[in-house]
């Protein structure tokens, strides 16, 4: 007969895994965007003082951005936020903390659309990226070097 654990089992995630290079894939994206400008736009949304405490608006918006960049439905995005440490890190969600449900993400997007902020926010993101000649592909940065180079004239 097998004995039960005498000691507490190790968690499935250790400090080493939390610093794995795969969890830094969105760090460049994080660094190039001026999030204070995004927060300023988001701050115009009324936050109710009643009911359950809400998620930070920037956390929800970061989640919606991941949904756009990775072409995820709200249900898929919520599932990724539960299981993907990279997504949790980008959205500033704690490892053991709650994660927004698909309905929360959808209601938040609808609220942004109703307040004419969704297109404005995406436009601000695109403006910042364009100013730095950056194209995002599935959350990864591609820097476009558009330096003009004079070529020698060809011909005889």
Residue ranges: model-predicted function:
Residues 3, 45, 62-63, 74-77, ...:
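Structured catalytic/translocation cores of nucleotide/phosphate-coupled proteins
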Residues 30, 68-69, 97, 110-114:
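Amphipathic alpha-helical interaction elements
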Residues 1-33, 40:
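Charged, often Cys/His-bearing segments associated with DNA-binding zinc-finger transcription factors
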Residues 23-65, 69-70:
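Basic, short loop/linker segments at the boundary and entry of helix-turn-helix/winged-helix-like folds
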Residues 75, 79-82, 91-93, 100-156:
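Polybasic low-complexity intrinsically disordered regions
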Residues 49-50, 93-95:
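Short, surface-exposed loop/turn segments at secondary-structure junctions
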């Amino acid at each position: 007969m097998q004995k039960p654990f005498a000691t507490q089992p190790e968690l499935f995630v250790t400090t080493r895994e939390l610093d794995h290079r795969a969890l830094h894939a969105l760090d460049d994206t994080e660094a190039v965007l001026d999030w204070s400008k995004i927060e300023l736009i988001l701050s115009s949304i009324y936050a109710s003082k009643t009911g359950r405490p809400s998620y930070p608006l920037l956390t929800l918006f970061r989640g919606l951005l991941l949904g756009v960049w990775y072409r995820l439905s709200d249900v898929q995005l919520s599932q990724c936020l539960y299981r993907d440490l990279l997504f949790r890190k980008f959205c500033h969600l704690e490892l053991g903390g709650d994660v927004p449900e698909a309905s929360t993400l959808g209601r938040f997007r609808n609220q942004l659309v109703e307040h004419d902020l969704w297109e404005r926010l995406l436009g601000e993101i695109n403006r910042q990226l364009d100013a730095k000649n950056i194209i995002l592909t599935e959350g990864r940065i591609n820097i476009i070097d558009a330096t003009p180079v004079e070529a020698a004239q060809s011909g005889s």
